[in-house]
Regions:
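Non-heme Fe(II) oxygenase catalytic core, chiefly the N-lobe of the double-stranded beta-helix
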Residues: 4-173
């Protein structure tokens, strides 16, 4: 099956909750894939089974202080950035990277933080085409697996990776 992903409109319910359709992967025997024509391209195709499900999403903002990295794998943190334009690659690297390094170190207690990349995405077709930005991902997914997480560490820090893999490490997305 090949389909162009269409955005699903969310419907407000109450107290910051919304009903939305989330597309999950459905096992069909076909290997799932996503093809994009690259940054700025409007050509996006996906394959593999699609299992759309209507779900109720609750805002976590009211309980923001209850979430912890150790228990939930995420937490809500307020951060005021000095970045004025998130489409400016130079600002992101020179201002936001150091901000995120300090933020993750302070929030996680990590002894070392390495900011290794970022991805700009937008659902606005005109902005995506004009600024050569990638499209949003329209499937429920995880970015790293048991195999790809350690492999990413090897790719980023090849000379240190094997020693670092003997200790605890985390890939934190901000």
């Amino acid at each position: 099956m090949v389909a162009i992903a269409e955005p699903q409109a969310a419907v407000a319910v109450t107290d910051g909750s919304v009903e939305a359709t989330l597309d999950y992967y459905l096992e069909t025997g076909e290997k799932p894939y996503t093809y994009t024509g690259g940054p700025g391209s409007l050509d996006v195709r996906t394959g593999g089974g699609k299992d759309p499900r209507q779900v109720l999403l609750h805002s976590g903002r009211q309980e923001a202080g209850d979430f912890t990295l150790d228990r939930n794998g995420f937490r809500f943190v307020r951060h005021d950035t000095k970045v004025g334009d998130f489409f400016d690659e130079a600002q992101i690297r020179s201002v936001y990277y150091p901000e995120m390094e300090a933020l993750v170190k302070a929030q996680s207690g990590a002894s070392r933080v390495v900011v290794f990349d970022h991805t700009l995405r937008t659902a606005d077709d005109a902005a995506r085409e004009a600024r050569k930005i990638r499209e949003v991902v329209r499937r429920v997914h995880n970015d790293y697996t048991e195999w790809s997480g350690p492999q990413r560490l090897r790719d980023i820090l090849p000379g240190e990776a094997e020693a670092l893999l003997q200790r605890r490490f985390a890939i934190v997305q901000v």
